[in-house]
Amino acid sequence: MQNTSASPTIVVLAHRRADHLFQVVESLRAASGFSRHRVLGIVDGEWPDSTKVLREGLDPQLLIRVRHEGHLHPRNRIARNLQIGLDLAFSHFSSPYCIVLEDDIVVSDDFLDFVAAVHAKHAKNPLFRAVNGFSKVSPKAGALPSDYVRLNYGVGWGWALPRRSYRQVQKLLARCGDFHWDGLVEPFMRTGYVVNPLRSRVINIGFDGSGAHTGSEEHQNTGRQMASSLLGPSEWRSTSTNLRLVARDFPWRQDVVPLDALGATGRLLAYGNGVLLFLLSALRYGLRNSPVWTSLLGLRRIRRLLLRVIPRLAAQRRQEG
C-alpha cells in the first residue's frame, strides 16, 4: 500500500561531467520546493569529482557508485542506473513519484513545483502516465507559463514517473540487450498521456557535444530553442489550480501526438495504438525477444505497422467541434 505522506524522490544520474553536474546541482538547490524531496545520487563508475559535487551540493539520502562488468554501451549503463534509482525511490523511499535528472539537465526554479502541481492535478486519472519538463515553444509563439499539453509520447530530459506507471514498466526496464531505456518505456506511455509545459522548465546543457548522443547542429539548435522557452527566475510558481490545459500543437518530433488538438476519434485511435504497442512489447518480453517466435508471429512487421500510424495521428487536426 502506498504511503501517501512519503516525499517524492529526485534521482540524479551522474558520470564524468562534474562541471555540468555542478550546474544541475546548483539549479536544484535554487528550485522552489527542493526541501520537500529526498535525493538519490547515482554515479556511473569511478568519478570522484562527480561524487564530491553530489555529496557536498545535495547531501543525498543515498549516494551510490555503480560498477558495471564488461564493456557496456553508455545507453545500457544509463538504463541499469535508472533501474536502480527508480527501484530505490519506490521500494526503499515509498515515494508517490520519482523525478529523474541526468547530469546535463538544468532546471528552472519552478520545475519541482510544476511537477508537483501536475501530479496533484492528474494523479487520479487512469490515463496519466508521466510528466516532462521540456519544451521549445517560445513566448513569442504565445506560450504562457500556465499552459500545458497532453501528449501521446514518451519521457526524457527532466521527467517524473508516478508509482502506478513504474509498476507497469518495471519488468520492461529489466530487459537484457542493447536497448535505449526510453524506447523500452515509451509503448506504455502511449497507452495514455504525458504532460509537457508550453514554457520549458529545463534546459539540456549536454547539447554542447559532451553527451553520449548529442552535439549535432540539430541538437545545438534544439538546445537554443529550449533556452528561449525556459521560464525565467521568479516568473511563475505553479500550483494545481493555476495550470491550464490547452489544445494546440507541440512542435518536437513527427511521432509526438498532441492529444487535445485531435477530436475524440483521434484520441481513441492514439490510445488504442499505444495499447497494442504495449501488449506487443510485453509479448516480446515474455518470449525473451526470441528471433524464432518473433519471426513466426510476425511481431516486427506488426510493430512497424503500428509505428506508421503515429506520425499520421500527429499530423491530424481537430475534425470535430
Q: What is each of the regions a protein language model found here?
A:
Residues Q2-V100, I105-G321:
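Peripheral/terminal regions associated with large enzymatic or DNA-binding modules
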